[in-house]
């Protein structure tokens, strides 16, 4: 009898251990650096960032993490990201996920000079546990990144949340259950995809408190498509989409997606999309024609234009994010002067969601003049203000406006940047 009980006991322990292993998504975590409040103040001063808009309240530990997440074929793949952990925390804090903009270069490093990483760092020191997912195929993850692909974007966020839930137990980091999602440009699409999939998943651990997608292409088959047929500052978007959707969906009956491109692009593009992807977006942009469609063979352009059942068009529709009804509050940030991601993406999303009965949704036009790059700063500020209302006031926030003095300073700063933008028309891409 005693021997039988021992066997049963070890059988139970073995089954429990197997279940634990099966449900484990965290692969590795490494503390890379710690920022003290003193070092953050020096960084803020160097970058002329007022603490009024980005308060410094905590030292921050920065972790490089790897985790396992579900790929489009159902298999589990390695992904990576950065986790910013506030220190000397006296009470449970909310979690914020920031999804970064378009990137093709795989070798992401933790850097104090990266503007997007700075958003996550700023959130952490102000009082959020802050996640910066790389997406699949960027950083130290496996495979290739799928551009503007809602499911893989969402899974990169969701499985990182699972991994961080495990890591928080190891770090004794206590969250208050609030979850905020945001991102800029592609990150706007990715964060909104994560919102949609999280609500569908309905995991009680990860209920979305609010989301604030910024300047994203939520309507993949609408106004955004006009840029394919005119001079466009970022022609790399089109081949990036085609290569990504071929890997995800096999949109063409060919093993060589590059056969869709005219010469010399059919031989140049593999150098940028295959292998280790060591080139940046600027390098890719420099080899492409000003009008994106001019890189594609005419018969494929004709198929896209005239055949509503073209597989590429169908797959684009599947990745639209405007026609659903979120449960959690939403703010859509954009600038009307954006010539890269049409502001009508946000307008249409707002209109369709209100038709679907969504009431707690805000359409926030931050400037009629600022473009895709210069809009980002003000979109982030508006997002922080939006999230802080829920952070401090829970499910029923006091939806007060920005304090008058702070609003005045924001107005002065915006006018100054608008004036500089009109005079310089910088083409540098930040997001």
PLM region spans:
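Accessory cap/linker subdomain of secreted extracellular hydrolases
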Residues: 214-323
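C-terminal catalytic histidine-bearing segment of alpha/beta-hydrolase fold enzymes
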Residues: 225, 304-315, 319, 340, ...
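Catalytic-loop region of hydrolases
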Residues: 20-90
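Short, surface-exposed "cap/lid" segments of acyl-processing enzymes
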Residues: 72-80, 84-123, 140
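Short alpha-helix in the alpha/beta-hydrolase fold that links the catalytic acid
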Residues: 194, 328-329, 342-353
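Gly/Ser-rich "nucleophile elbow"/oxyanion-hole loop immediately N-terminal to the catalytic nucleophile
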Residues: 85-92, 162-182, 201-206
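Alpha/beta-hydrolase active-site loop
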Residues: 147-169
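Short beta-strand/loop motif that positions the catalytic acidic residue
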Residues: 331-338
């Amino acid at each position: 009898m005693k021997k039988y009980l021992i066997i049963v006991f070890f059988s139970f322990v073995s089954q429990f251990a197997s279940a634990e292993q099966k449900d484990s998504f965290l692969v590795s975590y490494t503390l890379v650096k710690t920022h003290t409040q003193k070092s953050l103040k020096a960084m803020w001063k160097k970058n002329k960032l007022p603490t009024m808009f980005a308060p410094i309240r905590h030292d921050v530990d920065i972790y490089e993490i790897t985790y396992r997440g579900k790929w489009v074929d159902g298999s589990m793949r390695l992904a990576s990201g950065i986790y910013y952990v506030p220190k000397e925390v006296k009470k449970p804090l909310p979690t914020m996920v920031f999804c970064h903009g378009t990137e093709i270069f795989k070798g992401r490093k933790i850097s104090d000079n990266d503007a997007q990483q700075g958003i996550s760092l700023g959130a952490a020191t102000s009082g959020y546990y802050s996640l910066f997912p790389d997406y699949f195929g960027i950083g130290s993850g496996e495979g290739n990144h799928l551009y503007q692909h809602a499911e893989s974007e969402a899974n990169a966020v969701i499985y990182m949340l699972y991994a961080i839930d495990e890591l928080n137990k190891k770090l004794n980091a206590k969250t208050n259950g609030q979850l905020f999602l945001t991102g800029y440009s592609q990150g706007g699409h990715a964060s909104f995809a994560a919102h949609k999939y999280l609500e569908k998943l309905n995991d009680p651990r990860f209920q979305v408190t609010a989301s604030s997608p910024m300047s994203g292409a939520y309507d993949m088959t609408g106004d955004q498509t006009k840029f394919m047929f005119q001079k466009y500052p970022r022609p790399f978007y089109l081949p990036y989409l085609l290569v990504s959707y071929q890997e995800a969906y096999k949109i063409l009956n060919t093993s060589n997606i590059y056969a869709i491109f005219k010469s010399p692009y059919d031989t140049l593009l593999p150098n940028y999309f295959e292998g280790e992807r060591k080139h940046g977006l600027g390098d890719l942009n420099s080899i492409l024609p000003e009008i994106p469609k001019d890189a594609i063979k005419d018969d494929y352009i004709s198929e896209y234009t005239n055949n509503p059942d073209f597989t590429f068009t169908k797959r684009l529709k599947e990745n639209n994010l405007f026609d659903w009804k979120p449960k959690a509050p939403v703010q859509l940030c954009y600038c009307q002067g954006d010539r890269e991601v049409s502001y009508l993406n946000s307008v249409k999303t707002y209109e369709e969601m209100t038709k679907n009965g969504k009431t707690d949704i805000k359409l926030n036009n931050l400037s009629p003049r600022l473009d895709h790059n210069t809009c980002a700063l003000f979109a982030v500020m508006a997002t922080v203000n939006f999230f802080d209302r829920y952070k401090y006031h829970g499910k029923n926030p006091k939806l007060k406006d920005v304090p008058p003095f702070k609003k005045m300073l924001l107005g002065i700063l915006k006018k100054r940047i608008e004036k500089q933008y009109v005079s310089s028309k910088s083409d540098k891409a930040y997001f």
